[in-house]
Amino acid sequence: MGIFDKLKDVNEMRKQAKQIELQLANETVSGSSSGGKIKITMDGNQAIKSVEVDAAVAGDKSEVARHIRSALEDLFKHHKKMLQSKFGNMMQ
């Protein structure tokens, strides 16, 4: 394989990466803490789109922190499932 063939392959990979990035930008996933006190939504490229906080926990810093952690764990679990369902064959 010559250098021009390798460059062609690199350019093709860049195109594919850009297409995947565009596809992921159109996907959204959400995660919420137990009890739904905090809900976080992001796109498939992991850009946070919204954070919703129930007023019932807003005044308690330690409870807010606990709920944020729980919501983020749930969010990334859903994000991983979305990636596996869309691109599972590419992730092996």
Describe every region a protein language model picked out:
Residues 10, 46, 68:
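Residue-level signature of catalytic and energy-coupling elements of molecular machines
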